[in-house]
């Protein structure tokens, strides 16, 4: 499982010109799965994201997590995080997880985040989406469960 976390001031996702999800300050997550991912990966990444202290405290130090600042999450599925680019100029996506399983993992992951009390907006798994955001910082963190 791979997740790119971007701290944002605001973000939204649209599908076919219609806004599907929007947040004010919080995180934009780009989420990808590979075959073999399961509940252990979801638990690990959800814990890391919910406890990630990249929001400023009163002294301007990155010391607060998303729950402490009342932030929200915009979660976007993105199989292209598993692009293979070592050979040629056109990426291969064979390392990305089976779409049927990945869709279930994506839904479970978002439910797990929401169960913590954080508002979670989503795109649509497998859809062609337009994502817009205002990066804050910018702060971008990459998680890969193969590297834990």
Swiss-Prot record:
Enzyme class of the recorded protein, top EC level: hydrolase
Coiled-coil stretches: none
| CDD domains per record | Dtyr_deacylase (cd00563)
Protein's cellular compartments: Cytoplasm
Any one GO MF annotation of this record: tRNA binding
One GO biological process from the UniProt record?
D-amino acid catabolic process
Q: Does the keyword Cell inner membrane apply?
A: no
Highest taxon, organism lineage: Bacteria
Catalyses: glycyl-tRNA(Ala) + H2O = tRNA(Ala) + glycine + H(+); a D-aminoacyl-tRNA + H2O = a tRNA + a D-alpha-amino acid + H(+)
**What does the record say about domains?**
A Gly-cisPro motif from one monomer fits into the active site of the other monomer to allow specific chiral rejection of L-amino acids.
Q: What NCBIfam families would the database entry show?
A: D-aminoacyl-tRNA deacylase
Family to which the UniProt record says this protein belongs:
Belongs to the DTD family.
Its job? An aminoacyl-tRNA editing enzyme that deacylates mischarged D-aminoacyl-tRNAs. Also deacylates mischarged glycyl-tRNA(Ala), protecting cells against glycine mischarging by AlaRS. Acts via tRNA-based rather than protein-based catalysis; rejects L-amino acids rather than detecting D-amino acids in the active site. By recycling D-aminoacyl-tRNA to D-amino acids and free tRNA molecules, this enzyme counteracts the toxicity associated with the formation of D-aminoacyl-tRNA entities in vivo and helps enforce protein L-homochirality.
Name of the featured protein: D-aminoacyl-tRNA deacylase
Organism for this UniProt entry: Lactiplantibacillus plantarum (strain ATCC BAA-793 / NCIMB 8826 / WCFS1) (Lactobacillus plantarum)
């Amino acid at each position: 499982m791979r997740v790119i976390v971007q701290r944002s001031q605001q973000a939204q996702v649209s599908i076919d010109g219609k806004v599907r999800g929007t947040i004010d300050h919080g995180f934009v997550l780009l989420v990808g799965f590979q075959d073999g991912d399961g509940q252990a990966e979801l638990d690990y990444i959800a814990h890391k994201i919910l406890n990630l202290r990249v929001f400023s405290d009163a002294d301007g130090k990155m010391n607060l997590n998303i729950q402490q600042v009342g932030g929200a999450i915009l979660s976007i599925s993105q199989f292209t995080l598993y692009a293979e680019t070592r050979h040629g100029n056109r990426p291969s996506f064979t390392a990305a997880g089976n779409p049927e399983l990945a869709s279930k993992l994506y839904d479970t992951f978002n439910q797990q985040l929401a169960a913590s009390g954080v508002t979670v907006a989503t795109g649509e798994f497998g859809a062609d989406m337009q994502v817009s955001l205002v990066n804050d910082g910018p702060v971008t963190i990459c998680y890969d469960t193969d590297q834990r």
